């Protein structure tokens, strides 16, 4: 008899249920977590032994959405789920980031977390549910894990923080922030904001962390009731004698190497020192393990860099703690792109382009939460040459997808609305050099490229990456961190925004004990750095260009009676196809009668507008039109008039005398004046040639069919 153990609690406006012991009993641990009909099944499997020679912690997190969760069948050819979507990849990273620092440093056993969305309420995003599930499953598993963690989404509506807002509430929110952490510390923040102040952002982080304590308390209670025994795992004892010997041989030399400001030269010197020390020690004692020596060298290297920062000495590249690397900002660097910029900050460089397209270029995204269209795309590419390496080039990896989304969050708040700027915009950031903070360089480059393209963004935005080195109560916050400072430090803290406030905030914290005071210092220091960068950017381009590129499509908007849409489209799309071929434009029609005409040539667009006006013009009875014979039948002829509308000239209306054969008077393609004598209820048009040729007849209408 399967007997589940269930924990249920109120979490803000939602009810959360955590259930274990019912499913996947061969996994190390498994839980089903639900929040108001959104349910995620999370499993954890950990290997009891590490693989021989394992040098890193092999943690994998897979978040996967099943379409049956929303009562749908996949639309793919094979009618089953395929490779992870961008959203699934981002949520996998969201789960990975706060749990990874909570495993012991020397724990190298393989661990896999799989979160499967099995039921979805469109109002409840599964990501928070999956985070809670991963925390609960790891805590129940007995695997060495310094959790549990809680997770919360925070909105900001009517100047009030809202815990776990629904999908509809998020549409009204000026903030979408996810925070995760243990009982005593924030570990991860991911957010986008509509230009909020530093205090408002910090308040949201603290609010979310306080509110998620109920999650941690309930997971602890569940572990007390159903948790598996803790693994009998102990870290390998540190060889203190070897550590001292390595430090004696390497510390001073590594200290000198870390005074070399150029990255590649520094890396070459550090590698040479490590090779020399390893070789020397193995020559003295060939029973030593080279891998262990390398690990200790890494630890010594970290101690050297961190201790110098804490003593207030200059950083690796000679800067003070709050200094920004040298900036070089250029726009319009590529002649045929719609907008381009080259942003360089020290040894980090991004070549960023902006491309304008029409509504049909927008991305249609079919998600579990529903379908949507995205008219602002930002893609980030990190080729291996950017760090002087060789490697695979192909589809974007998890890191590239995550960095691209962060850069997009930084820019999204200043993008114009579709009514203000009816273009699809694609920004691509090519990282050509990297030594820290390439995602924030992408934010700066995106802002510049958009202004160069003439996109009327509300304000320029810039991004900065902050770091932290902390020992006991002593801490130093670093501005514009290098790659090494990111790797050897305790926090990666990225902030993007305009002069007026923050648009995106991302934090990844590797240690506990990050207080509100430390986060406040980091945010204020980041603001100073952001304003400095914006000042330099404004010297290159301070406002969006007054006009878009000559190579970009120009979009003209007109409005017609919605009842006339069928006339513009024509049977099977025949009219609109003929129009686009004839005018060389792209034409998009919306349900409310709005028509968008895109063309690189203004004259072509005007021609298309004129033709649409002809097609949608009301046919006036008793008016004379210039027409063209399109079909001849026994009882008369069909004649196209204004805008391609077709009417019938009955055989009795061709001439004043009796007509025996229509072809005696008319030929296919012949142009003739006709008078509208009736439009019936079905819209059928009766025409007359003989009334159009009477002495008192008016001249044909000038806007007749061409």
UniProtKB/Swiss-Prot annotation:
CC cofactor: Mg(2+)
GO MF annotation: an example: polyribonucleotide nucleotidyltransferase activity
Top-level taxon of origin: Bacteria
Chain sites annotated for binding Mg(2+): 486, 492
InterPro entries attached to this UniProt entry: ExoRNase_PH_dom1, ExoRNase_PH_dom2, ExoRNase_PH_dom2_sf, KH_dom, KH_dom_type_1, KH_dom_type_1_sf, NA-bd_OB-fold, PNPase
Enzyme Commission numbers on file: 2.7.7.8
Record's keyword terms, sorted: Cytoplasm, Magnesium, Metal-binding, Nucleotidyltransferase, RNA-binding, Transferase
Catalytic activity reported: RNA(n+1) + phosphate = RNA(n) + a ribonucleoside 5'-diphosphate
Classification via CDD domains: KH-I_PNPase, RNase_PH_PNPase_1, RNase_PH_PNPase_2, S1_PNPase
EC top class, as a word: transferase
Classification via SMART domains: KH (SM00322), S1 (SM00316)
Cellular location(s): Cytoplasm
S1 motif domain ranges (all copies): 622-690
Keyword Manganese annotated: no
GO cellular component, one term: cytosol
Coiled coil regions, renumbered to chain: none
Domain (KH): residue spans on this chain: 553-612
UniProt cross-references to NCBIfam families, sorted A to Z: polynuc_phos, PRK11824.1
Free-text function comment from the UniProt entry: Involved in mRNA degradation. Catalyzes the phosphorolysis of single-stranded polyribonucleotides processively in the 3'- to 5'-direction.
Similarity comment: family membership: Belongs to the polyribonucleotide nucleotidyltransferase family.
Subunit description: Component of the RNA degradosome, which is a multiprotein complex involved in RNA processing and mRNA degradation.
Protein name per Swiss-Prot or TrEMBL: Polyribonucleotide nucleotidyltransferase
Organism name: Yersinia enterocolitica serotype O:8 / biotype 1B (strain NCTC 13174 / 8081)
Gene: pnp
């Amino acid at each position: 008899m399967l007997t589940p153990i269930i924990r249920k609690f109120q979490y803000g406006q939602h009810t959360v249920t955590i259930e274990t012991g019912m499913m996947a009993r061969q996994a190390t641990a498994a839980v089903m977590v639900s929040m108001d009909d959104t349910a995620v099944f999370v499993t954890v499997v950990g290997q009891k032994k590490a693989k021989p020679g394992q040098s890193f912690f092999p943690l994998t997190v897979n978040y996967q959405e099943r379409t049956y969760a929303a009562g749908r069948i996949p639309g793919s050819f094979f009618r089953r789920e395929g490779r992870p979507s961008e959203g699934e990849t981002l949520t996998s990273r969201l789960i990975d980031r706060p749990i990874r620092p909570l495993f012991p440093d020397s724990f190298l056993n393989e661990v896999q977390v799989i979160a499967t969305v099995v039921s979805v309420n469109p109002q409840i995003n599964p990501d928070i549910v999956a985070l809670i599930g991963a925390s609960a499953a790891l805590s129940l598993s007995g695997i060495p894990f310094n959790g549990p963690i809680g997770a919360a989404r925070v909105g900001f509506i009517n100047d009030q923080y809202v815990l776990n807002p629904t999908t509809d509430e998020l549409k009204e929110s000026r903030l979408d922030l996810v925070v995760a952490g243990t009982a005593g510390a924030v570990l991860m923040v991911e957010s986008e904001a509509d230009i909020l102040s530093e205090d408002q952002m910090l308040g949201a982080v603290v609010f979310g962390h306080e509110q998620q304590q109920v999650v941690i308390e309930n997971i602890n209670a569940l572990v007390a009731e159903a948790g598996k025994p803790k693994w009998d795992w102990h870290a390998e004892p540190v060889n203190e004698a070897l550590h001292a010997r390595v430090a004696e041989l390497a510390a001073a030399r590594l200290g000198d190497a870390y005074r070399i400001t150029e990255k590649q030269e520094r890396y070459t010197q550090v590698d040479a020192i490590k090779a020399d020390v390893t070789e020397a020690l193995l020559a003295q004692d060939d029973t030593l393990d080279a891998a262990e020596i390398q690990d200790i060298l890494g630890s010594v290297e970290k101690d050297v860099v961190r201790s110098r920062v804490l003593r207030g000495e200059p950083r690796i590249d000679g800067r003070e703690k709050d200094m920004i690397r040298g900036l070089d900002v250029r726009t319009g660097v590529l002649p045929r792109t719609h907008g381009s910029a080259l942003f360089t900050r020290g040894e980090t460089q991004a070549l960023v382009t902006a491309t304008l397209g029409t509504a049909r270029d927008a991305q249609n995204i079919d998600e579990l939460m529903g379908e949507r269209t995205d008219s602002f795309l930002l893609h980030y590419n990190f080729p291996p040459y950017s760090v002087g390496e060789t490697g695979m080039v192909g589809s974007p990896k998890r890191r590239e997808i995550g960095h691209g989304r962060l850069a997009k969050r930084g820019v999204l708040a200043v993008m114009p609305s579709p009514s203000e700027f009816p273009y699809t915009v694609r920004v691509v950031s090519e990282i050509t050099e990297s030594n820290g903070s390439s995602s924030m360089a992408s934010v700066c480059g995106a802002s510049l490229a958009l202004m160069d393209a003439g996109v009327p963004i509300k304000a320029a935005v810039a991004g900065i990456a902050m770091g932290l080195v902390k020992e006991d109560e002593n801490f130093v916050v670093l501005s514009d961190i290098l790659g090494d400072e990111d790797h050897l430090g305790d926090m990666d803290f990225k902030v993007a925004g305009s002069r007026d406030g923050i648009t995106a905030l991302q934090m990844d914290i590797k240690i506990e004990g990050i207080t509100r005071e430390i986060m406040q210092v980091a945010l204020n220091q980041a603001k100073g750095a952001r304003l400095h960068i914006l000042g330099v950017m404004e010297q290159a381009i301070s406002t969006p260009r007054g006009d878009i590129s000559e190579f970009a499509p120009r979009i003209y908007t007109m409005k017609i009676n919605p009842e006339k849409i069928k006339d513009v489209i024509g049977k099977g799309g025949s009219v609109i196809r003929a129009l686009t071929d004839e005018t060389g434009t792209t034409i998009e029609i919306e349900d409310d009668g709005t028509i968008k005409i895109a063309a690189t040539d203004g004259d072509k667009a005007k021609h298309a507008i004129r033709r649409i006006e002809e097609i949608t013009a009301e046919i006036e009875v008793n008016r004379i039109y210039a027409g063209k014979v399109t079909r001849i039948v026994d009882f008369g002829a069909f004649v196209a008039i204004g805008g391609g509308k077709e009417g019938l000239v009955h055989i009795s209306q061709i001439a004043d005398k009796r007509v025996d054969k229509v072809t005696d008077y008319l030929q296919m393609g012949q142009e003739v004046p006709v008078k509208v004598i009736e439009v019936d209820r079905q819209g059928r048009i009766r025409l007359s040639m003989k009334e159009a040729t009477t002495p008192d007849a008016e001249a044909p209408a000038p806007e007749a069919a061409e």
